[in-house]
Amino acid sequence: HGYMYTGFQPQITYTTPALGGFSASAGIFDPNKFAGDETKDPGFQAMANYDWASGAAKGSLWAGAIHQRTSGAGSFNASGFELGAKIGIGAFEAVAYGFDASGLGLSTVGALYLSPFGKTDGKGYFVQTTYTVGKTKFGINFGENRDSGGALADTNKFRSATVGVYHSLNKYITLVGEYNQEKGDGDDLFAGDLKTRTISVGGILMF
């Protein structure tokens, strides 16, 4: 919710050498068959990053773009742009991100190949803050995606908010506790609002 999924995905990629914290990547990907519908042209994606550090502060800026022409019943160009920033000062860290897209839908996966709503306009944003005390990190985030236009009768929206606690036992195991609340609305997708609340407790094993 609030971001372009799944991030950078080209199968053939060129990445520039890092220069003063700046780097860029560009590539192509070709999902030539997606649940029965074909794409005649490969997709293109590019990403630029800038990382910096000064004393106790450090941060990153990034921007990305994606484009692919879809085929099938009702061809169109699908494209999107994203911009994000991350900053950390001591134990505090924050992330802000936003995107604007055309023909990518709410999930931005598959470029709406199978969508009955045609080429729609999407946008979204995501914000997150965390604070670390010892081996325990506390975090909260909120994100929202909106989709409108095309054959949609309404503006479809998904929102999600999460509060979490993450405790590192060692370099391999992190204990996790989260509360998440999601809401979706839009007459094209739901016969009324969709609301879910989830409490999850578990662990992350890294190896």
Roles of regions detected by a PLM:
Residues 25-29, 95-97, 141, 176-178, ...:
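Outer-envelope exported proteins of Gram-negative bacteria
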Residues 162-180:
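C-terminal closing repeat unit and adjoining cap/tail of repeat-based domains
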Residues 1-44, 110-114:
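Surface-exposed coil loops of outer-membrane beta-barrel proteins
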Residues 2-9, 30-41, 71-76, 119, ...:
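Solvent-exposed loop/turn segments connecting transmembrane beta-strands
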Residues 46, 167, 195-207:
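Outer-membrane beta-barrel "beta-signal"
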Residues 70-71, 179-185, 196:
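A short, acidic, flexible beta-alpha connecting loop/helix-capping segment that sits on the rim
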Residues 19-21, 53-59, 172:
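Short loop/turn motifs that connect adjacent beta-strands in outer-membrane beta-barrel proteins
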